[in-house]
């Protein structure tokens, strides 16, 4: 597959993201506008819950209402208070989110507690399922670090009802890596849930070349046809600029951002 071909696919799989403390309505509107490209639109935009209504309005105004709106809960620290995570998820759904990316209580798992993670995901899933909202679970691979813990967090999340497992918040020193992605994709394969569980690489995927490596990895493990927006996403902001440069046949630009 050529770089242009993989860049076009990667664009269609993006959750175009802004999750900054200084986000404003204007920045969210600009994000939505950036997602309307001559090469198509991303799968979703991802914003903080309070910006979901403004994103909905912006997407509709520009004729791209097919773009989903994702948001985050229990973010970014993955605290182990189930009630707060559930309350935040209920609020996110009430704001009108199509998808919720909840942070798994990874520190509890690192301390040996598997139950909190299971219950938190299970209860958030119940909230989402009642409103036909997709639930992605961020396991924070760069903090879990070991293959054993990454696999365990993936398994717990899947068994508790996750629709997607996601590498990272983008708020810690180490985010998505191909090594971590392989463990998560192989867990989806080994549990025989590829028909109902997807994978999202977030943070650290910045170039068309890097995106192509993730696509190739997913195709190797789960098959060519599996890689579509129902099963695979990139969480990114700066990646879009680079993909558009590749699609326009320009040399890669150095970009900063998530």
UniProtKB/Swiss-Prot annotation:
<dbReference type="GO" id="GO:0006018">
    <property type="term" value="P:2-deoxyribose 1-phosphate catabolic process"/>
</dbReference>
<feature type="active site" description="Schiff-base intermediate with acetaldehyde">
    <location>
        <position position="166"/>
    </location>
</feature>
<dbReference type="GO" id="GO:0009264">
    <property type="term" value="P:deoxyribonucleotide catabolic process"/>
</dbReference>
<keyword id="KW-0456">Lyase</keyword>
<dbReference type="InterPro" id="IPR011343">
    <property type="entry name" value="DeoC"/>
</dbReference>
<dbReference type="GO" id="GO:0005737">
    <property type="term" value="C:cytoplasm"/>
</dbReference>
<feature type="active site" description="Proton donor/acceptor">
    <location>
        <position position="200"/>
    </location>
</feature>
<dbReference type="GO" id="GO:0004139">
    <property type="term" value="F:deoxyribose-phosphate aldolase activity"/>
</dbReference>
<dbReference type="InterPro" id="IPR002915">
    <property type="entry name" value="DeoC/FbaB/LacD_aldolase"/>
</dbReference>
<dbReference type="InterPro" id="IPR013785">
    <property type="entry name" value="Aldolase_TIM"/>
</dbReference>
<keyword id="KW-0963">Cytoplasm</keyword>
<comment type="function">
    <text>Catalyzes a reversible aldol reaction between acetaldehyde and D-glyceraldehyde 3-phosphate to generate 2-deoxy-D-ribose 5-phosphate.</text>
</comment>
<feature type="active site" description="Proton donor/acceptor">
    <location>
        <position position="101"/>
    </location>
</feature>
<dbReference type="GO" id="GO:0016052">
    <property type="term" value="P:carbohydrate catabolic process"/>
</dbReference>
<dbReference type="InterPro" id="IPR023649">
    <property type="entry name" value="DeoC_typeII"/>
</dbReference>
<keyword id="KW-0704">Schiff base</keyword>
<dbReference type="Pfam" id="PF01791">
    <property type="entry name" value="DeoC"/>
</dbReference>
<comment type="pathway">
    <text>Carbohydrate degradation; 2-deoxy-D-ribose 1-phosphate degradation; D-glyceraldehyde 3-phosphate and acetaldehyde from 2-deoxy-alpha-D-ribose 1-phosphate: step 2/2.</text>
</comment>
<comment type="similarity">
    <text>Belongs to the DeoC/FbaB aldolase family. DeoC type 2 subfamily.</text>
</comment>
<protein>
    <recommendedName>
        <fullName>Deoxyribose-phosphate aldolase</fullName>
        <ecNumber>4.1.2.4</ecNumber>
    </recommendedName>
</protein>
